Amino acid sequence: MTPAGKRILVMAGGTGGHVFPALAVAKYLAQQGWQVRWLGTADRMEARLVPQYGFDIDFIDIKGVRGNGLIRKLAAPFKVVRSILQAKAVIAEFKPDVVLGMGGFASGPGGVAARLAGIPLVLHEQNAIPGMTNKLLSRIATQVLCAFKNTFTTVKAKVVGNPIRQELIALGAEPKPEADEALKVLVVGGSLGAKVFNDLMPEAVAILSQQQSVTVWHQVGKDNLAGVKAAYQQHGQDGGVNIAEFIDDMEAAYRWADVVLCRAGALTVSELAAVGLPSILVPYPHAVDDHQTRNGQVLVEAGAAFLLPQAILDVNKLAGKLQLLANDRTELARMGQRARDVAVLDATEQVAAVCISLAEKG
């Protein structure tokens, strides 16, 4: 597809929503013979995660400024200039043919440094509302890509979906097994858990189990295991519940589930679509610009999900939605198919193709 020896600098960090899609593209290009290098920050998750995938990573010193104190904001311009110079040094040493920015603090200085060096800059925005870094960089980027329609209003952007792991794409293509009598509910609140799910699910399951057999696989987050387990026991529901601080094998969890209760992060929404699972979405209420609500609307408008704002969520509403899905397995299956229908399954290849094209143009 492309001559071996091409080089790409990938900039993504801070959260899994940035890092994992970037890793999907990096792995794909590495398989094509590309040399991949990463730019990130030393105190965020990319510092630990990226080397595990065999990629070299360089660090620059940059932190976010949005919502911080006055002194930090006054110092920010000087820190930004320093971080741009740090990124410039990395670029001068590595000499990438193209730079890919997928969000996180390092993307801003790295993107500016790339354009100052005359290197093509590709941006990819995972959320339905762009983050501040990508919003600013979109004005100077060579090509802007996004996962959802109407993400950018001031620049022309190509909609390509969110890159996700090939294992999940393959899972979505598998025939769905016959539904068990028990409704299987997967609860995922992120690596830290979601307090609202941990607080409400034990009682909601108790209410639901009066009418319906139900089993639960609940990711409760770090340090929450004992408290949530006790809550399920208090409501007499510990028998059909699998509780874990963190679910390492999401492929197995998605394969097991009939329905997913979760937040509406961009990567989560894209994964639900790819694996073809119906969902109850509770957007994180403190997300910047309420972007999770916009993310979730993609599945809601397709008829593949229910969206419940956390401000109005209570035990009875949650139990009621689960009961509704349990009572109509045919509609549950249709919701799963609608989710799969809106999935963009070649997002990784599309992002890679843009990078390849720009690198070949020089």
From Swiss-Prot:
Uppermost EC category: transferase
Annotated positions binding UDP-N-acetyl-alpha-D-glucosamine: 15-17, 127, 165, 191, 247, 266-271, 292
Pathway: Cell wall biogenesis; peptidoglycan biosynthesis
Principal subcellular localisation of the protein: membrane
EC numbers: 2.4.1.227
GO biological process, any: lipid glycosylation
GO molecular function, one term: UDP-N-acetyl-D-glucosamine:N-acetylmuramoyl-L-alanyl-D-glutamyl-meso-2,6-diaminopimelyl-D-alanyl-D-alanine-diphosphoundecaprenol 4-beta-N-acetylglucosaminlytransferase activity
Catalytic function, reaction form: di-trans,octa-cis-undecaprenyl diphospho-N-acetyl-alpha-D-muramoyl-L-alanyl-D-glutamyl-meso-2,6-diaminopimeloyl-D-alanyl-D-alanine + UDP-N-acetyl-alpha-D-glucosamine = di-trans,octa-cis-undecaprenyl diphospho-[N-acetyl-alpha-D-glucosaminyl-(1->4)]-N-acetyl-alpha-D-muramoyl-L-alanyl-D-glutamyl-meso-2,6-diaminopimeloyl-D-alanyl-D-alanine + UDP + H(+)
Compartment list: Cell inner membrane
Pfam family, one: Glyco_transf_28
Similarity section: Belongs to the glycosyltransferase 28 family. MurG subfamily.
Protein name in the entry: UDP-N-acetylglucosamine--N-acetylmuramyl-(pentapeptide) pyrophosphoryl-undecaprenol N-acetylglucosamine transferase
